[in-house]
Amino acid sequence: MYILTNILSIISNDVPTPYALGFQDSATPNQEGILELHDNIMFYLLVILGLVSWMLYTITKTYSKNPLPYKYMKHGQFIEIIWTIFPAVVLLIIAFPSFILLYLCDEVISPAMTVKVIGYQWYWKYEYSDFVNSNGETVEFESYIIPDDLLEEGQLRLLDTDTSVVVPVDTHIRFIVTAADVIHDFAIPSLGIKVDANPGRLNQVSALIQREGVFYGMCSELCGTGHSQMPIKIEVVSLGKYLGWLNEQ
């Protein structure tokens, strides 16, 4: 029974995998919308590829057998209308869902908590500005990559950190992102989050994480020699576990 349960359980892919050609599994409505938009656009592109391939094949196959001397025809108004209107319609079909999703991803909906993210060369600092510890100080900590020689069994190379961001599941979370030195980028693929961290500027993005788990990301803006050593690790837990973790800070 235990083996059957493991087989039937859903195992989500929340980390990069070698030679992967697809996306990581979504954990937020924003990422679900991104995946759906990608699938729709891919469908349109495959239809266009098939149509153009069929036209080229038909033209090359029947051109020599065509009895009509089209070399003296200067223009064809009907076909010119078709190849102007058809691409315009396809672009509109792709553009409208893209614009809607773009604005939805930028919208911050009544956040229940805020996490401030500050990028440094080459680590992240996190501040829970809504909470204070027993000393009356804001809950904050720095997050560094775990070196290869200190990795334990089960930890991921270039992805695991010494401390991780802990947030509750099914909660509207706002990330306020900035940087202290150069431009960084706070990106977690499974959450559909990718926002620039610019010195002197505050950018914000919201997330409603719908399942528990550990989600990994990386700095996605070239920021110097240690750019590849800025992983992001977010642990999503139940509200009870989150409050217990918060009391320990």
Curated annotation (Swiss-Prot):
It is a multi-pass membrane protein. Mg(2+) binds at residue 221. Its EC number is 7.1.1.9. The keyword Transport applies. Cu cation A1 binds at residues 184, 219, 223, 230. Keywords: Copper, Electron transport, Magnesium, Membrane, Metal-binding, Mitochondrion, Mitochondrion inner membrane, Respiratory chain, Translocase, Transmembrane, Transmembrane helix, Transport. Its cofactor is Cu cation. Cu cation A2 binds at residues 219, 221, 223, 227. The chain crosses the membrane at residues 40-60, 81-101. GO terms for biological process: ATP synthesis coupled electron transport. Binds a dinuclear copper A center per subunit. PANTHER family: CYTOCHROME C OXIDASE SUBUNIT 2, CYTOCHROME C OXIDASE, SUBUNIT II. Component of the cytochrome c oxidase (complex IV, CIV), a multisubunit enzyme composed of a catalytic core of 3 subunits and several supernumerary subunits. The complex exists as a monomer or a dimer and forms supercomplexes (SCs) in the inner mitochondrial membrane with ubiquinol-cytochrome c oxidoreductase (cytochrome b-c1 complex, complex III, CIII). Belongs to the cytochrome c oxidase subunit 2 family. This is Cytochrome c oxidase subunit 2. It comes from Vanderwaltozyma polyspora (strain ATCC 22028 / DSM 70294 / BCRC 21397 / CBS 2163 / NBRC 10782 / NRRL Y-8283 / UCD 57-17) (Kluyveromyces polysporus). The lineage of its organism: Eukaryota, Fungi, Dikarya, Ascomycota, Saccharomycotina.
